[in-house]
């Protein structure tokens, strides 16, 4: 294939042939395909880093974790903001912060998926980044989820505590602008 040739990437015509030629694979595919793709790779003895979320539901996610443990393979869920240089720099400066707020707003992103899908597909980035920045030892104090009549997410906001650090995460799916901010 031209793209493979231009980047000198060996072509694989199936997941099993790809697995046979790799020690590790990064999976960036639809969430619905994660369980099948990741389990195929793990069963082939390949270490896996998969873009979030690990699976469509908790049961499948737990099955993948158990499979990786049984096979003694690395299974990592990737969140791209954890590797962004500015977020890494901010993380080093949070020791003296009293509050952390992360907002991700979209101007017209309501639907077509339900609340559950949007929480796992998009809002999860906001919560994960905020909790990672805080060191991951936060407890949920409360929050709000708003949907329209079709069950699609309009707004989410949650409040966490990590020792003296107060954390707020927020997403508005029908805001006046596209914006992602972090304040500490």
Regions found by a protein language model. Give the residues of each.
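Beta-loop-alpha module in the N-terminal Rossmann-like domain of NAD(P)-dependent dehydrogenases
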Residues: 7-49, 53-65
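Short loop/edge segments at beta-strand edges and connector loops
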Residues: 13, 29, 50, 77-79, ...
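Active-site phosphate/pyrophosphate- and oxyanion-stabilizing loops and adjacent acidic/basic residues
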Residues: 16, 88, 92, 127-131
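A contiguous active-site-proximal alpha/beta segment in oxidoreductase catalytic domains
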Residues: 32, 55-111
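Rossmann-like dinucleotide-binding domain that binds NAD(P)(H)
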Residues: 108-179
């Amino acid at each position: 294939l031209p793209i493979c040739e231009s980047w000198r990437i060996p072509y694989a015509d199936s997941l099993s042939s790809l697995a046979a030629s790799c020690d590790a694979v990064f999976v960036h595919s639809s969430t619905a395909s994660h369980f099948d793709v990741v389990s195929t790779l793990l069963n082939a003895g390949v270490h896996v880093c998969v873009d979030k979320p690990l699976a469509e539901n908790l049961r499948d996610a737990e099955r993948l974790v158990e499979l990786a443990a049984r096979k003694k393979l690395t299974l990592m869920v990737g969140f791209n903001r954890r590797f962004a240089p500015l977020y890494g720099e901010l993380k080093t400066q949070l020791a003296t912060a009293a509050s952390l707020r992360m907002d991700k707003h979209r101007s017209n992103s309501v639907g077509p998926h339900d609340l559950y899908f949007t929480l796992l597909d998009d809002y999860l980035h906001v919560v994960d980044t905020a909790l990672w920045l805080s060191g991951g030892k936060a407890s949920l104090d409360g929050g709000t989820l708003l949907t329209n009549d079709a069950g699609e997410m309009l707004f989410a906001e949650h409040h966490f505590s990590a020792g003296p650090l107060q954390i707020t995460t927020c997403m508005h799916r029908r805001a006046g602008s596209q914006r992602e901010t972090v304040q500490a």
